[in-house]
Structures are given as structure tokens and as C-alpha cells.
UniProtKB/Swiss-Prot annotation:
This is NADH-quinone oxidoreductase subunit F. NAD(+) binds at G54, R55, G56, G57, A58, G59, F60, S61, T62, G63. NDH-1 shuttles electrons from NADH, via FMN and iron-sulfur (Fe-S) centers, to quinones in the respiratory chain. Couples the redox reaction to proton translocation (for every two electrons transferred, four hydrogen ions are translocated across the cytoplasmic membrane), and thus conserves the redox energy in a proton gradient. Keywords: 4Fe-4S, Flavoprotein, FMN, Iron, Iron-sulfur, Metal-binding, NAD, Quinone, Translocase. It comes from the Bacteria.
Length: 420
């Protein structure tokens, strides 16, 4: 359990004002110049030593990602913050944008300095109108106070931060599609290599990080890498904001230690499963893109990257979707299939054709008028899509179906037999 003094997002639930004055009282912008004066190498090394892994889903070392940026680039460098939070079941970044905007902006300054970027873009989901307004007000306050802009915090470093609103496309959450959209083009993922660190925004070195990943950086630098690394589990350090929704008594966002047991998280903060723990059917532990896990696994699994990977799923965004026995599990996954079909950009044939095909088969399974042989055929198609697309949307469309067949095949077959 996370100690009160170890919480990073003190105002996660908006109990206090999110303006600059209140944020400073909570410790934001506390002698930021001293952190900048320690130099780029110090910041990158400290973030590396903290063990911070990307909070957007991939779980790659944040400090390592920063170190890939060229030290002395002839081209301008950019930092891009991915605030295009569109994953079903995920709303952690939204509350950070709402109630902790100055943590994010201070993190943008420190990260920009670390990678040598004088310009930073916050790419926010188009539907987040109120959140975008909050961020813009916070940016205006920071500029007025001399915290960002020319000679930011009196450090001699110039850092401009811009807010850019997207247009509602889920695919723009993929980092290279986001860059395309930021450049004014249709949001379609790029082939890699080249990677953004060498050829990113406008063909210049670019680092893309998630909102939560950037927002925790100031606290890590103030309290030290060892403090952050002491929280959680080895290779899964620090705190994490989890979103708990679905069939729970109190849906909520909560900051807890990485590696907290899933059962404890739900019972302590979300008031337990509706109808009691024994009424649980399955949980999607990391947003809609990861495979579901049945009650038997939920009993003992911990909420961290490695434990969930071992359990055949993933931490993803930390969006926990709880489903009790009243859930039509086949229809629930079919709805996710429809979402991915709708959000496919159409660039890759396996995804463009496969997502629509999978949804149509899933709907036949929902109605029970499919053949049993189609279950294996469907699984085969998910394997053909997985790993054969430019971006991970193909994998994201395939994994929920794979999880369904792996754990609830009997229920699918029973439905086919019952309705034949």
C-alpha cells in the first residue's frame, strides 16, 4: 500500500484548486532552477536509475528513451507529450490534465532540457475540451511567471510549450501517427526505422512520452532516484495511476504502488465487485488492448508489467475493466472488435481487412449461428494479424479475442450448441 507521504499526485481527485498558487503550495515549481543547473546528464541518469518505465502502455525505460536523443544535433529537437488518451477503460491522464496541470508543465520543462529541446508540444485528445482549457490556463500562468518561455526559471534555457488539440482519431495515440497529425497530415503510423529519436517531428530528433511519464519526473528529481526505486517491485518501480471501472461499487482513479495485488486494489479502493468477489467473471487489467484474465488468475496476480505478462495479459495503461457474472463476455469482446474495426486507419491490409472480418465472425458467435470450426479459424486470423502491421493497433485488435478464446472457449461453444 502506498504511504500518504509517497503520493505524487496529491490533487488527483481535484480536492484543491489547480491554479499556479495552489500548485506551488503542493510543491510544484519548487526551485526548479536548481534541478536545471545540475545539467542534462544528471537528469537523464537520475530518471534511468529511478527505473521509471513508460506509463502509456509499452513500459520502455523513460531515461533510456531520452538517452537516444543526439547530444549535439544540427537540427532542432522536440519533445511531444502524448495526451491523446482514447483507450477504452482509461482515464488516468485526463485527471492529471484536469487537476495537476502544473506537474505536467514542469515535467515538460525538465524533460525538454534533458533532451535539448527548446520546443515542446502537448498533443491532447480533441474531445478533452475542458482539460485543454485547464492546460492552456496553466501554460499562460507559467509564461506570466517566467517559469517557461525565454530564460525559463532564470536558467538561461529557452523552452516554449504549445498545446495542440487532436480531432478524435484513436490511431493518433500511436506515436508516429501523432507526429503525422501534428504536422497537419492524416494520422497514419510511419514505418520504423527511422525512429523518432533520429527522424521525428518535421524530420527532426523527437521524443514522445505519455502524460503520466512526464508528470512524475519533477518529483523523482526532487526526492531522488533511490526514493522512487524503493517503491514497488524490482523492474517495476514507483507509483502508478490505475483506473477502475465496470462492475465495481465505486469506480475510481487511484495512485498506488506498482505491483499491488489486483484483488486488493479493487476491494480497497473500488468498494469490491458488484455482488461480491465470488461474482467476478473476468477483468481486463490494462485497457481494452490487453487480453482479459479470468477470476482464477485475478485472485493472485499483481498489477505490474512483468506479473501480468506472465499471466498472459499486460499492464497496458492500467485501465482495469471489471466484469461480473452478469456480463455477456462474448458480446463484450465483440464490441471491442467493432471499436478497433472503426478506428483502423486502413494503411495495413491485415488490420484493414482483418478487423472487419473478426468483428463479423464475433457477431456470429454472439448470435450463436457460427460453426465451432470458426473459433479456431478466428484464432488463426488473430495470429496472422498480430505482429504483421506497421503499428500495434493490429495486435490490440487481436489480443482481446485471443484472451476470450483462451479462457472462455467453453462458453462460446455452449452458446453455439444451445442456439443451433
Amino acid at each position: 500500500m502506498l504511504k500518504e507521504e509517497d503520493k505524487i499526485f496529491i490533487n488527483l481527485h481535484g480536492q484543491q484548486s489547480h491554479d499556479l498558487k495552489s500548485s506551488k503550495k503542493r510543491g510544484d515549481w519548487d526551485n526548479t532552477k536548481a534541478l536545471l543547473d545540475k545539467g542534462r546528464d544528471f537528469i537523464i541518469e537520475e530518471v534511468k536509475q529511478s527505473g521509471l518505465r513508460g506509463r502509456g502502455g509499452a513500459g520502455f525505460s523513460t531515461g533510456m528513451k531520452w538517452s537516444f536523443m543526439p547530444k549535439n544535433s544540427e537540427k532542432p529537437c522536440y519533445l511531444v507529450v502524448n495526451a491523446d488518451e482514447s483507450e477504452p477503460g482509461t482515464c488516468k491522464d485526463r485527471d492529471i490534465l484536469r487537476f495537476e496541470p502544473h506537474k505536467l508543465i514542469e515535467g515538460c520543462l525538465l524533460a525538454s532540457f534533458a533532451i535539448g529541446a527548446n520546443n515542446c508540444y502537448i498533443y491532447i485528445r480533441g474531445e478533452f475540451y475542458n482539460e485543454a482549457s485547464n492546460i492552456q490556463r496553466a501554460l499562460d500562468e507559467a509564461y506570466k511567471d517566467g517559469l517557461i518561455g525565454k530564460n525559463a526559471c532564470g536558467s538561461g534555457f529557452d523552452c516554449n510549450i504549445y498545446l495542440h488539440c487532436g480531432a478524435g482519431a484513436y490511431i493518433c495515440g500511436e506515436e508516429t501517427a501523432l507526429l503525422e497529425s501534428l504536422e497537419g497530415k492524416k494520422g497514419m503510423p510511419r514505418l520504423k526505422p527511422p525512429f523518432p529519436a533520429s527522424f521525428g517531428l518535421y524530420g527532426c530528433p523527437t521524443t514522445i512520452n505519455n502524460v503520466e511519464s512526464i508528470a512524475v519526473v519533477p518529483t523523482i528529481l526532487r526526492r531522488g532516484a533511490n526514493w522512487f526505486a524503493s517503491i514497488g517491485k524490482p523492474n517495476n518501480t514507483g507509483t502508478k495511476v490505475f483506473c477502475i471501472s465496470g462492475h465495481v461499487n465505486k469506480p475510481c482513479n487511484v495512485e498506488e504502488v506498482m505491483g499491488i495485488p489486483l484483488k486488493e486494489l479493487i476491494e480497497k479502493y473500488a468498494g469490491g465487485v458488484q455482488g461480491g468477489w465470488n461474482n467476478l467473471k473476468a477483468i481486463i487489467p490494462g485497457g481494452s488492448s490487453v487480453p482479459l484474465i479470468p477470476k482464477s488468475i485475478c485472485e493472485t496476480v499483481d498489477m505490474d508489467f512483468d506479473s501480468l505478462r506472465t499471466a498472459g495479459s499486460g499492464l497496458g495503461t492500467g485501465g482495469i475493466i471489471v466484469m461480473n457474472q452478469s456480463t455477456d463476455i462474448v458480446y463484450a469482446i465483440a464490441r471491442l472488435s467493432k471499436f478497433y474495426m472503426h478506428e483502423s486507419c486502413g494503411q495495413c491490409t491485415p488490420c484493414r481487412e482483418g478487423t472487419g472480418w473478426m468483428w463479423r465472425v464475433m457477431m456470429r458467435l454472439v448470435k450463436g449461428n457460427a460453426k465451432k470450426s470458426e473459433i479456431d479459424q478466428l484464432l488463426s486470423v488473430t495470429k496472422a494479424i498480430e505482429g504483421h502491421t506497421i503499428c500495434a493497433l493490429g495486435d490490440a485488435a487481436a489480443w482481446p479475442i485471443q484472451g476470450l478464446i483462451r479462457h472462455f472457449r467453453d462458453e462460446i461453444e455452449e452458446r453455439i450448441c444451445h442456439l443451433m
